[in-house]
Protein backbone atom coordinates (compact mmCIF):
# COMPACT_ATOMS: atom_id res chain seq x y z
CA UNK A 1 0.00 0.00 0.00
CA UNK A 2 1.34 3.43 -0.99
CA UNK A 3 0.87 6.02 1.76
CA UNK A 4 1.94 8.98 -0.38
CA UNK A 5 -1.13 10.78 -1.56
CA UNK A 6 -1.06 11.99 -5.16
CA UNK A 7 -1.49 15.65 -6.16
CA UNK A 8 -5.00 14.85 -7.35
CA UNK A 9 -5.95 13.15 -4.07
CA UNK A 10 -4.62 16.11 -2.07
CA UNK A 11 -6.62 18.49 -4.27
CA UNK A 12 -9.83 16.54 -3.68
CA UNK A 13 -9.15 16.50 0.06
CA UNK A 14 -8.61 20.27 0.07
CA UNK A 15 -11.72 20.92 -2.03
CA UNK A 16 -13.85 18.82 0.34
CA UNK A 17 -12.28 20.57 3.37
CA UNK A 18 -13.02 24.03 1.93
CA UNK A 19 -16.56 23.04 1.02
CA UNK A 20 -17.20 21.67 4.52
CA UNK A 21 -15.87 24.84 6.17
CA UNK A 22 -17.65 27.28 3.87
CA UNK A 23 -20.91 25.51 3.07
CA UNK A 24 -21.59 22.88 5.73
CA UNK A 25 -20.38 24.51 8.93
CA UNK A 26 -22.77 27.48 8.74
CA UNK A 27 -26.11 26.18 10.00
CA UNK A 28 -24.94 22.71 11.06
CA UNK A 29 -26.14 23.25 14.66
CA UNK A 30 -29.54 24.48 13.48
CA UNK A 31 -29.98 21.63 10.99
CA UNK A 32 -29.22 19.17 13.81
CA UNK A 33 -31.67 20.93 16.14
CA UNK A 34 -34.47 21.12 13.53
CA UNK A 35 -33.77 17.80 11.76
CA UNK A 36 -33.35 19.79 8.55
CA UNK A 37 -31.97 18.03 5.49
CA UNK A 38 -29.05 19.95 3.88
CA UNK A 39 -30.83 20.28 0.52
CA UNK A 40 -28.80 23.13 -0.96
CA UNK A 41 -25.52 21.71 0.28
CA UNK A 42 -26.24 18.25 -1.15
CA UNK A 43 -27.06 19.87 -4.49
CA UNK A 44 -23.65 21.57 -4.46
CA UNK A 45 -21.97 18.31 -3.47
CA UNK A 46 -23.51 16.78 -6.58
CA UNK A 47 -22.14 19.60 -8.73
CA UNK A 48 -18.68 19.00 -7.22
CA UNK A 49 -18.81 15.32 -8.19
CA UNK A 50 -19.01 14.13 -4.57
CA UNK A 51 -22.15 12.03 -5.04
CA UNK A 52 -20.81 9.71 -7.74
CA UNK A 53 -17.13 9.95 -6.98
CA UNK A 54 -15.98 6.58 -8.28
CA UNK A 55 -18.45 6.21 -11.15
CA UNK A 56 -17.17 6.26 -14.74
CA UNK A 57 -17.65 9.77 -16.24
CA UNK A 58 -19.63 8.20 -19.10
CA UNK A 59 -22.37 7.58 -16.51
CA UNK A 60 -22.11 11.03 -14.95
CA UNK A 61 -19.54 10.16 -12.28
CA UNK A 62 -16.26 11.81 -11.31
CA UNK A 63 -14.09 8.74 -12.12
CA UNK A 64 -11.97 9.03 -8.98
CA UNK A 65 -10.37 6.31 -6.88
CA UNK A 66 -11.58 4.97 -3.56
CA UNK A 67 -8.77 6.58 -1.51
CA UNK A 68 -10.00 9.98 -2.76
CA UNK A 69 -13.45 8.94 -1.59
CA UNK A 70 -12.10 8.17 1.91
CA UNK A 71 -10.34 11.54 2.01
CA UNK A 72 -13.42 13.49 0.92
CA UNK A 73 -15.73 11.56 3.25
CA UNK A 74 -13.47 12.29 6.22
CA UNK A 75 -13.50 16.04 5.50
CA UNK A 76 -17.27 16.20 5.04
CA UNK A 77 -17.99 14.09 8.15
CA UNK A 78 -15.64 16.18 10.33
CA UNK A 79 -18.07 19.05 9.96
CA UNK A 80 -21.42 17.47 9.10
CA UNK A 81 -21.85 13.73 9.61
CA UNK A 82 -25.42 13.97 8.27
CA UNK A 83 -24.26 15.26 4.88
CA UNK A 84 -21.62 12.53 4.97
CA UNK A 85 -24.13 9.69 5.26
CA UNK A 86 -26.17 11.10 2.36
CA UNK A 87 -22.94 11.03 0.36
CA UNK A 88 -21.95 7.55 1.55
CA UNK A 89 -25.28 5.91 0.72
CA UNK A 90 -25.49 7.53 -2.71
CA UNK A 91 -21.90 6.65 -3.62
CA UNK A 92 -21.33 3.26 -2.06
CA UNK A 93 -24.69 1.58 -1.82
CA UNK A 94 -26.61 3.03 -4.74
CA UNK A 95 -24.16 4.15 -7.46
CA UNK A 96 -21.53 1.46 -6.85
CA UNK A 97 -24.18 -1.28 -6.89
CA UNK A 98 -25.72 -0.01 -10.12
CA UNK A 99 -22.39 0.52 -11.87
CA UNK A 100 -21.20 -2.98 -11.04
CA UNK A 101 -24.38 -4.99 -11.49
CA UNK A 102 -27.08 -3.07 -13.40
CA UNK A 103 -27.86 -3.51 -17.11
CA UNK A 104 -26.70 -0.89 -19.61
CA UNK A 105 -30.27 0.38 -19.93
CA UNK A 106 -30.61 0.72 -16.14
CA UNK A 107 -27.28 2.54 -15.94
CA UNK A 108 -28.29 5.08 -18.56
CA UNK A 109 -31.69 5.68 -17.01
CA UNK A 110 -30.87 5.57 -13.29
CA UNK A 111 -27.13 5.65 -12.62
CA UNK A 112 -26.42 8.76 -14.71
CA UNK A 113 -28.74 11.16 -12.85
CA UNK A 114 -27.73 9.60 -9.51
CA UNK A 115 -23.97 9.81 -10.08
CA UNK A 116 -24.13 13.37 -11.41
CA UNK A 117 -26.12 14.42 -8.35
CA UNK A 118 -29.27 15.49 -10.21
CA UNK A 119 -31.18 13.17 -7.89
CA UNK A 120 -30.26 11.04 -4.89
CA UNK A 121 -30.89 7.39 -4.14
CA UNK A 122 -31.65 5.11 -1.21
CA UNK A 123 -30.95 1.47 -0.38
CA UNK A 124 -33.79 -0.43 1.26
CA UNK A 125 -32.77 -3.69 2.91
CA UNK A 126 -33.67 -3.38 6.61
CA UNK A 127 -37.13 -4.27 7.82
CA UNK A 128 -38.93 -4.12 11.18
CA UNK A 129 -37.93 -7.76 11.75
CA UNK A 130 -34.90 -8.14 9.47
CA UNK A 131 -31.91 -5.94 10.32
CA UNK A 132 -28.80 -7.99 11.03
CA UNK A 133 -30.54 -11.20 9.91
CA UNK A 134 -30.85 -9.90 6.38
CA UNK A 135 -32.02 -13.16 4.78
CA UNK A 136 -35.28 -13.02 6.78
CA UNK A 137 -36.90 -10.59 4.36
CA UNK A 138 -40.69 -10.28 4.73
CA UNK A 139 -41.14 -7.85 1.83
CA UNK A 140 -42.33 -9.85 -1.15
CA UNK A 141 -42.12 -9.28 -4.89
CA UNK A 142 -44.44 -11.70 -6.59
CA UNK A 143 -43.66 -12.57 -10.20
CA UNK A 144 -46.77 -11.69 -12.23
CA UNK A 145 -45.36 -12.28 -15.71
CA UNK A 146 -44.72 -8.79 -17.07
CA UNK A 147 -44.07 -7.26 -13.67
CA UNK A 148 -43.42 -7.97 -9.99
CA UNK A 149 -45.94 -7.00 -7.32
CA UNK A 150 -44.15 -5.49 -4.33
CA UNK A 151 -45.63 -5.59 -0.81
CA UNK A 152 -44.06 -4.90 2.57
CA UNK A 153 -42.34 -2.39 4.83
CA UNK A 154 -38.73 -1.21 4.96
CA UNK A 155 -37.36 0.55 8.05
CA UNK A 156 -34.72 3.18 8.84
CA UNK A 157 -34.00 4.03 5.24
CA UNK A 158 -31.40 6.77 4.85
CA UNK A 159 -32.45 9.36 2.21
CA UNK A 160 -35.90 7.74 2.52
CA UNK A 161 -37.86 10.97 2.14
CA UNK A 162 -35.61 12.73 -0.36
CA UNK A 163 -34.57 10.00 -2.80
CA UNK A 164 -35.93 9.72 -6.31
CA UNK A 165 -34.81 6.12 -6.86
CA UNK A 166 -34.71 3.27 -4.35
CA UNK A 167 -32.92 -0.05 -4.53
CA UNK A 168 -35.35 -2.38 -2.78
CA UNK A 169 -34.47 -5.91 -1.67
CA UNK A 170 -37.40 -8.34 -1.57
CA UNK A 171 -38.23 -12.02 -1.32
CA UNK A 172 -39.44 -13.55 -4.59
CA UNK A 173 -39.36 -17.21 -3.55
CA UNK A 174 -39.27 -17.96 0.21
CA UNK A 175 -38.58 -21.68 -0.46
CA UNK A 176 -35.19 -20.79 -1.87
CA UNK A 177 -34.10 -18.77 1.19
CA UNK A 178 -31.35 -16.29 0.22
CA UNK A 179 -31.36 -17.53 -3.37
CA UNK A 180 -35.02 -16.45 -3.57
CA UNK A 181 -34.21 -12.78 -2.93
CA UNK A 182 -34.01 -10.09 -5.62
CA UNK A 183 -33.02 -6.42 -5.84
CA UNK A 184 -35.19 -3.94 -7.74
CA UNK A 185 -35.03 -0.29 -8.77
CA UNK A 186 -38.20 1.42 -7.57
CA UNK A 187 -39.12 4.99 -8.47
CA UNK A 188 -40.56 7.49 -6.03
CA UNK A 189 -44.16 8.28 -6.90
CA UNK A 190 -45.13 4.84 -8.21
CA UNK A 191 -48.67 3.91 -7.26
CA UNK A 192 -48.86 2.12 -3.89
CA UNK A 193 -45.45 3.41 -2.72
CA UNK A 194 -45.84 5.47 0.44
CA UNK A 195 -43.12 7.13 2.50
CA UNK A 196 -43.59 6.83 6.28
CA UNK A 197 -42.96 9.59 8.84
CA UNK A 198 -39.45 10.88 9.45
CA UNK A 199 -37.62 9.20 12.36
CA UNK A 200 -36.71 11.45 15.30
CA UNK A 201 -33.11 10.35 15.87
CA UNK A 202 -30.34 10.70 18.50
CA UNK A 203 -27.75 11.72 15.91
CA UNK A 204 -27.21 12.41 12.20
CA UNK A 205 -30.38 14.44 12.58
CA UNK A 206 -29.83 16.40 9.37
CA UNK A 207 -30.13 13.17 7.40
CA UNK A 208 -33.49 11.91 6.36
CA UNK A 209 -34.57 8.51 7.73
CA UNK A 210 -37.97 7.01 6.95
CA UNK A 211 -39.83 3.76 6.68
CA UNK A 212 -41.13 2.85 3.22
CA UNK A 213 -44.48 1.16 2.69
CA UNK A 214 -45.20 -0.84 -0.47
CA UNK A 215 -48.76 -1.77 -1.17
CA UNK A 216 -49.18 -3.64 -4.48
CA UNK A 217 -46.49 -1.61 -6.24
CA UNK A 218 -45.96 -2.80 -9.82
CA UNK A 219 -42.27 -3.10 -10.73
CA UNK A 220 -41.51 -3.62 -14.43
CA UNK A 221 -39.49 -6.79 -15.09
CA UNK A 222 -36.69 -4.68 -16.51
CA UNK A 223 -36.11 -3.09 -13.08
CA UNK A 224 -34.76 -6.25 -11.46
CA UNK A 225 -30.99 -6.00 -10.95
CA UNK A 226 -29.06 -9.00 -12.25
CA UNK A 227 -30.16 -12.61 -12.68
CA UNK A 228 -33.15 -14.03 -10.82
CA UNK A 229 -32.13 -14.84 -7.23
CA UNK A 230 -29.10 -12.53 -7.18
CA UNK A 231 -30.52 -9.98 -4.73
CA UNK A 232 -28.93 -11.22 -1.50
CA UNK A 233 -25.48 -11.60 -3.02
CA UNK A 234 -25.97 -8.16 -4.57
CA UNK A 235 -26.78 -6.67 -1.15
CA UNK A 236 -23.77 -8.33 0.49
CA UNK A 237 -21.40 -7.19 -2.26
CA UNK A 238 -22.71 -3.63 -2.10
CA UNK A 239 -22.51 -3.53 1.71
CA UNK A 240 -18.85 -4.58 1.61
CA UNK A 241 -18.09 -1.33 -0.22
CA UNK A 242 -20.62 0.62 1.84
CA UNK A 243 -18.64 -0.23 4.95
CA UNK A 244 -15.67 1.75 3.60
CA UNK A 245 -17.97 4.77 3.33
CA UNK A 246 -19.28 4.42 6.88
CA UNK A 247 -15.78 3.73 8.23
CA UNK A 248 -14.65 6.98 6.59
CA UNK A 249 -17.64 8.81 8.03
CA UNK A 250 -16.68 7.47 11.49
CA UNK A 251 -13.08 8.51 10.86
CA UNK A 252 -14.25 12.03 10.04
CA UNK A 253 -16.43 12.24 13.16
CA UNK A 254 -13.42 11.14 15.25
CA UNK A 255 -10.93 13.50 13.62
CA UNK A 256 -13.40 16.40 13.79
CA UNK A 257 -13.83 15.86 17.54
CA UNK A 258 -10.08 15.42 18.03
CA UNK A 259 -9.23 18.66 16.20
CA UNK A 260 -11.73 20.59 18.32
CA UNK A 261 -10.42 19.01 21.54
CA UNK A 262 -6.80 19.74 20.63
CA UNK A 263 -7.55 23.36 19.84
CA UNK A 264 -9.50 23.76 23.07
CA UNK A 265 -6.77 22.07 25.16
CA UNK A 266 -4.16 24.48 23.77
CA UNK A 267 -6.10 27.57 24.82
CA UNK A 268 -8.15 26.67 27.89
CA UNK A 269 -6.28 27.27 31.12
CA UNK A 270 -6.69 25.47 34.45
CA UNK A 271 -4.35 25.47 37.42
CA UNK A 272 -2.34 28.33 35.82
CA UNK A 273 -1.50 26.56 32.55
CA UNK A 274 -3.11 25.42 29.30
CA UNK A 275 -4.83 22.13 29.98
CA UNK A 276 -2.76 20.33 27.32
CA UNK A 277 0.13 20.65 29.78
CA UNK A 278 -1.70 18.37 32.18
CA UNK A 279 -0.80 14.80 31.49
CA UNK A 280 -4.39 13.65 32.11
CA UNK A 281 -5.46 15.66 29.05
CA UNK A 282 -2.32 15.19 26.94
CA UNK A 283 -2.54 11.40 27.21
CA UNK A 284 -6.18 11.44 26.07
CA UNK A 285 -5.12 13.43 22.99
CA UNK A 286 -2.20 11.06 22.36
CA UNK A 287 -4.58 8.07 22.40
CA UNK A 288 -7.00 9.85 20.08
CA UNK A 289 -4.29 10.78 17.56
CA UNK A 290 -2.92 7.22 17.52
CA UNK A 291 -6.31 5.58 17.11
CA UNK A 292 -7.43 8.00 14.40
CA UNK A 293 -4.24 7.35 12.43
CA UNK A 294 -4.80 3.58 12.73
CA UNK A 295 -8.44 3.96 11.62
CA UNK A 296 -7.35 6.03 8.62
CA UNK A 297 -4.84 3.35 7.61
CA UNK A 298 -7.55 0.67 7.75
CA UNK A 299 -9.78 2.82 5.54
CA UNK A 300 -6.94 3.35 3.05
CA UNK A 301 -6.17 -0.38 3.04
CA UNK A 302 -9.76 -1.35 2.26
CA UNK A 303 -10.04 1.40 -0.37
CA UNK A 304 -6.78 0.37 -2.05
CA UNK A 305 -7.86 -3.27 -2.11
CA UNK A 306 -11.22 -2.29 -3.57
CA UNK A 307 -9.54 -0.43 -6.43
CA UNK A 308 -7.27 -3.44 -7.00
CA UNK A 309 -10.41 -5.57 -7.44
CA UNK A 310 -9.72 -7.68 -4.35
CA UNK A 311 -12.33 -9.19 -2.00
CA UNK A 312 -12.89 -6.44 0.57
CA UNK A 313 -15.35 -8.22 2.85
CA UNK A 314 -12.68 -8.58 5.57
CA UNK A 315 -10.83 -5.27 5.14
CA UNK A 316 -14.07 -3.27 4.82
CA UNK A 317 -15.48 -4.89 7.97
CA UNK A 318 -12.24 -4.29 9.90
CA UNK A 319 -12.20 -0.62 8.85
CA UNK A 320 -15.82 -0.12 9.91
CA UNK A 321 -15.52 -2.06 13.17
CA UNK A 322 -12.44 -0.17 14.28
CA UNK A 323 -13.23 3.33 12.97
CA UNK A 324 -16.71 3.31 14.52
CA UNK A 325 -15.25 2.33 17.92
CA UNK A 326 -12.67 5.11 17.56
CA UNK A 327 -15.45 7.57 16.69
CA UNK A 328 -17.35 6.64 19.84
CA UNK A 329 -14.29 6.69 22.14
CA UNK A 330 -12.85 9.89 20.68
CA UNK A 331 -16.05 11.89 20.80
CA UNK A 332 -16.72 10.88 24.42
CA UNK A 333 -13.22 12.03 25.38
CA UNK A 334 -13.57 15.24 23.34
CA UNK A 335 -16.67 16.12 25.38
CA UNK A 336 -14.75 15.28 28.57
CA UNK A 337 -11.82 17.54 27.60
CA UNK A 338 -14.24 20.39 26.93
CA UNK A 339 -15.84 19.90 30.36
CA UNK A 340 -19.08 21.86 30.78
CA UNK A 341 -18.59 23.56 27.40
CA UNK A 342 -18.57 20.17 25.74
CA UNK A 343 -22.08 19.51 26.98
CA UNK A 344 -23.60 22.49 25.18
CA UNK A 345 -24.41 22.61 21.50
CA UNK A 346 -22.28 25.52 20.30
CA UNK A 347 -19.02 23.63 20.86
CA UNK A 348 -20.02 20.88 18.35
CA UNK A 349 -18.52 17.93 20.24
CA UNK A 350 -21.76 16.79 21.85
CA UNK A 351 -23.30 16.56 18.36
CA UNK A 352 -20.34 14.55 17.10
CA UNK A 353 -20.75 12.20 20.09
CA UNK A 354 -24.41 11.65 19.22
CA UNK A 355 -23.55 11.24 15.53
CA UNK A 356 -20.85 8.66 16.30
CA UNK A 357 -23.19 6.03 17.77
CA UNK A 358 -24.96 5.14 14.54
CA UNK A 359 -21.68 4.18 12.86
CA UNK A 360 -21.62 1.13 15.18
CA UNK A 361 -25.13 0.18 14.06
CA UNK A 362 -25.93 0.85 10.39
CA UNK A 363 -24.57 -1.01 7.37
CA UNK A 364 -23.92 -3.92 9.71
CA UNK A 365 -23.57 -3.60 13.49
CA UNK A 366 -20.17 -4.06 15.12
CA UNK A 367 -21.29 -7.57 16.04
CA UNK A 368 -22.04 -8.33 12.37
CA UNK A 369 -18.60 -6.99 11.38
CA UNK A 370 -17.07 -9.46 13.84
CA UNK A 371 -19.07 -12.30 12.21
CA UNK A 372 -17.77 -11.24 8.78
CA UNK A 373 -14.16 -10.93 10.00
CA UNK A 374 -14.16 -14.16 12.02
CA UNK A 375 -15.67 -16.17 9.13
CA UNK A 376 -13.06 -14.71 6.79
CA UNK A 377 -10.07 -15.49 8.98
CA UNK A 378 -11.41 -18.98 9.75
CA UNK A 379 -11.53 -19.89 6.04
N1 LIG B 1 -19.57 -10.47 0.99
C1 LIG B 1 -20.01 -11.19 -0.08
N2 LIG B 1 -20.87 -12.20 0.02
C2 LIG B 1 -21.31 -12.52 1.26
C3 LIG B 1 -20.91 -11.82 2.41
C4 LIG B 1 -20.00 -10.76 2.24
N3 LIG B 1 -19.56 -10.00 3.26
N4 LIG B 1 -21.53 -12.35 3.48
C5 LIG B 1 -22.29 -13.34 3.03
N5 LIG B 1 -22.16 -13.44 1.68
C6 LIG B 1 -22.82 -14.41 0.78
C7 LIG B 1 -22.33 -15.83 1.04
O1 LIG B 1 -21.16 -16.12 0.29
C8 LIG B 1 -23.52 -16.63 0.58
O2 LIG B 1 -23.56 -16.68 -0.82
P1 LIG B 1 -23.63 -18.08 -1.66
O3 LIG B 1 -24.76 -18.88 -1.08
O4 LIG B 1 -23.85 -17.65 -3.06
O5 LIG B 1 -22.32 -18.75 -1.43
C9 LIG B 1 -24.71 -15.77 0.99
O6 LIG B 1 -24.21 -14.43 1.07
C10 LIG B 1 -25.35 -16.18 2.30
O7 LIG B 1 -24.33 -16.13 3.26
P2 LIG B 1 -24.48 -16.69 4.74
O8 LIG B 1 -25.01 -18.08 4.71
O9 LIG B 1 -23.18 -16.44 5.42
O10 LIG B 1 -25.64 -15.74 5.31
P3 LIG B 1 -26.10 -15.48 6.79
O11 LIG B 1 -27.57 -15.54 6.84
O12 LIG B 1 -25.31 -16.30 7.75
O13 LIG B 1 -25.75 -13.90 7.00
C11 LIG B 1 -24.49 -11.93 7.36
C12 LIG B 1 -24.60 -13.31 6.69
C13 LIG B 1 -23.04 -11.54 7.18
C14 LIG B 1 -24.80 -11.97 8.84
C15 LIG B 1 -25.45 -10.96 6.63
O14 LIG B 1 -26.79 -11.29 6.87
C16 LIG B 1 -25.21 -9.50 6.96
O15 LIG B 1 -24.26 -8.90 6.46
N6 LIG B 1 -26.11 -8.91 7.79
C17 LIG B 1 -26.05 -7.47 8.06
C18 LIG B 1 -26.90 -6.73 7.10
C19 LIG B 1 -26.60 -5.27 7.11
O16 LIG B 1 -25.46 -4.84 7.01
N7 LIG B 1 -27.66 -4.47 7.19
C20 LIG B 1 -27.51 -3.05 7.12
C21 LIG B 1 -28.68 -2.45 6.43
S1 LIG B 1 -28.30 -1.34 5.15
C22 LIG B 1 -28.09 0.18 5.89
O17 LIG B 1 -27.86 0.31 7.05
C23 LIG B 1 -28.15 1.30 4.92
C24 LIG B 1 -28.37 2.68 5.36
O18 LIG B 1 -29.40 3.26 5.10
C25 LIG B 1 -27.25 3.46 5.96
Explain the meaning of each model-derived region:
Residues 1-89, 101-106, 113, 117-118, ...:
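Alpha-helical interface subdomain recognition
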Residues 49, 73-77, 170, 186-191, ...:
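Short Ser/Thr-interspersed hydrophobic loop/turn segments at strand-loop and sheet-helix junctions
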Residues 92-100:
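Helix-loop "lid/cap" segments that line or gate small-molecule binding pockets
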Residues 114, 129-132, 156-159, 173-175, ...:
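Short Gly/Pro-enriched turn/cap motifs at secondary-structure boundaries
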Residues 117-125, 169:
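A short, Trp-centered hydrophobic/proline-enriched beta-strand micro-motif
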Residues 136, 191-220:
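Flexible, small-/acidic-enriched active-site or ligand-binding loops
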Residues 147, 151-195:
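A short core secondary-structure module
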Amino acid sequence: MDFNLSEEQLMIQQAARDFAQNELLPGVIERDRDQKFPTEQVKKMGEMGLLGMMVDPKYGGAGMDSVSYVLAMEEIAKIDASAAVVMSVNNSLVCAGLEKFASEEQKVKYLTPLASGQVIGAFALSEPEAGSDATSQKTTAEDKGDYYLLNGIKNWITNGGTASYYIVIAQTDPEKKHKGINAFIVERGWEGFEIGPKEDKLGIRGSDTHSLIFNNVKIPKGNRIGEDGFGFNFAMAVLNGGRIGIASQALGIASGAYELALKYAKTRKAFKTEIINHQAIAFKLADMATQITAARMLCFKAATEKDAGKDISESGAMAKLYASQVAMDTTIEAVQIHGGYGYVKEYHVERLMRDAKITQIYEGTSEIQKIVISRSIAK
